[in-house]
Amino acid sequence: MSNMEDRILSNTVRNEDYEIEGGLRPKFLNDYIGQDKVKERMKIFIEAALHRNEALDHVLLYGPPGLGKTTLSNIIANEMNVNIKITSGPVIERAGDLAAILTNLSENDVLFIDEIHRINRTVEEVLYPAMEDYALDIIIGKGPSARSIRLDLPKFTLIGATTRAGLLTGPLRDRFGVIAKLELYDTEQLKEIIRRSAYILNVYIDDNGAKEIASRSRGTPRIANRLLKRVRDFAQVRGDGRITLEIAQEALELLEIDLLGLDNTDKKMIETMIHNFGGGPVGLDTLAAATGEERNTIEDVYEPYLLQIGFINRTPRGRIVLEKAYNHFNIPFQK
């Protein structure tokens, strides 16, 4: 059984994140840090839609967890000055569930569906005319006497979010007019996010302390805000409440998060690949069985960051460990 949800470095949502993120989320694009190319495009699309007094075209946001897909969706609704309805793919079990949501939307509203790749195929087919024609096809009756009626819907914007864009069907993906990939953040962007969050939380943090937390946050704002909260606890109990470089280092060492933001779970993953499979190539299913992690967890949670920092590579034959990872964990590298 995976203990991924218990990790402080997990980029999936934990209960505490709702409390943290709720008060820290920016409300408008000008306050949204990072993802500059996506922001620039969205500003143009939003301004054009407002100028024409139309609903924004449907938007697909994809990328690793914790990068701000939900936040960006709320911002889009705020910028368009409309309401947002939030749901997720697994929650919409029947076509009737989706119909109830769609018929309760107002003109130009935003419907945000998280994990849209997990939506039921029957439900997905109801989405097609809703997205294309702003209409809902309903079957009345059964058997030979069954007939279809079409209900007009208010014009709306569907924002779909996914960590697995490759799992979307072609017909669904093709109905999104705007497709945007959210990238992992760099240290400077995360430092800015941490400074902003600390200000909102009324916590003093110096530049070096913010940079130290940022450098160990795996390129992910959700993790950065979570670590900030943990370091704040440490500063209040072991210090004077101020977060300095020294306090940040002590707190993160206590949490067993190394200089690159890796923990014992990452170390186990890399060491398993090296010691059990000679550094690879090793298939994803084999690696999942050897580490006790889910295949999807490895692909969505661990791999994006390990790929970004140059510790592993994906090949047609499987995953391989690169020399940089051997050096980091002090394991002799053999070509």
UniProtKB/Swiss-Prot annotation:
Its EC number is 3.6.4.-. It catalyses: ATP + H2O = ADP + phosphate + H(+). Mg(2+) binds at T70. Has 3 domains, the large (RuvB-L) and small ATPase (RuvB-S) domains and the C-terminal head (RuvB-H) domain. The head domain binds DNA, while the ATPase domains jointly bind ATP, ADP or are empty depending on the state of the subunit in the translocation cycle. During a single DNA translocation step the structure of each domain remains the same, but their relative positions change. PANTHER family: HOLLIDAY JUNCTION BRANCH MIGRATION COMPLEX SUBUNIT RUVB (PTHR42848:SF1), PTHR42848. Homohexamer. Forms an RuvA(8)-RuvB(12)-Holliday junction (HJ) complex. HJ DNA is sandwiched between 2 RuvA tetramers; dsDNA enters through RuvA and exits via RuvB. An RuvB hexamer assembles on each DNA strand where it exits the tetramer. Each RuvB hexamer is contacted by two RuvA subunits (via domain III) on 2 adjacent RuvB subunits; this complex drives branch migration. In the full resolvosome a probable DNA-RuvA(4)-RuvB(12)-RuvC(2) complex forms which resolves the HJ. This is Holliday junction branch migration complex subunit RuvB. The gene is ruvB.
